[in-house]
């Protein structure tokens, strides 16, 4: 029995039995795939530590409760479930909620259901939508192990073809923004990514490095936690315009900075102006996922509209089909991101 009042989880059983959570799930649900010896040992350990399978989750395979679960993975690493100046998640969740109601379902927003302290209701939905999963994401591993249907918004970069996913097309977004910056006059473009191990960060970095190699440019690549928000501005300007161990001192300062998050872009713009670097005259600044602050800052900042309302509605449609054990037809296509050119990349034509 575990110490204190901690409720034993499938992970605790797996650790005690020295097997994977997926193996525990197979053993406890008598689904085959493991030897009877292993299954009996797992069941015995589960009894010993007091593990009780989630009755709601196990009942999913027999009946429907008319609920879709939404797991927004970036919120699990941000400083708040309501990050200041960010409307992407609100737009996504609102559209998904209404789309679910339209289909006769309700939407339940949950945090990481694979955590030991997650509530019993976290695995109660008929199907799940998981946004921006991480490499080898434990949420996907758990859902797959429990045979609970799910669809992802963007894919697990370590398992790109393992699960149904609406791909975010990070490669296309990077290509589009780099082309825009060059057309606006940029010659040396730096990229600032986040640190979450998701496909958006990884594929954007890879595409940027590929572009640098193909065009004979020296990469100027920095990464900062998404949770830092606009506070990264001074660090980015220090690294790119002052002596820093992050980049060779011989690297010329960039004339454009592309930040994958809108809050990073806002912080960089503010910090540059505070140092006397004019935006956009001396430095072009652009963001990937736009934030409200990018539309109200001075200057306003060029970003993408990732169309979260459309993505949310499409994901709900797919999740409902999975919940009703209907096949998903054809590849899952996300709507293209729309570049919104604003003052930070628009220079006066004189």
Language-model features, listed with the residues they occupy:
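Short acidic/polar active-site loop segments enriched in Thr and Asp
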Residues: 20, 66, 126, 187-188, ...
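N-terminal helix-turn-helix DNA-binding module of bacterial transcription factors
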Residues: 1-66, 349-350
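Amphipathic helical "hinge" segments at domain boundaries
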Residues: 2, 51-117
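Hinge/beta->alpha junction and helix N-cap segments in small-molecule ligand-binding domains
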Residues: 77-79, 83-88, 112-116, 166-176, ...
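Short acidic capping loops at alpha-helix termini that bridge into adjacent secondary structure
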Residues: 187-189, 219-221, 279-284
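Flexible loop/turn connectors
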Residues: 241-350
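Flexible loop/hinge segments that line or gate small-molecule binding clefts
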Residues: 134-175, 263, 289-301
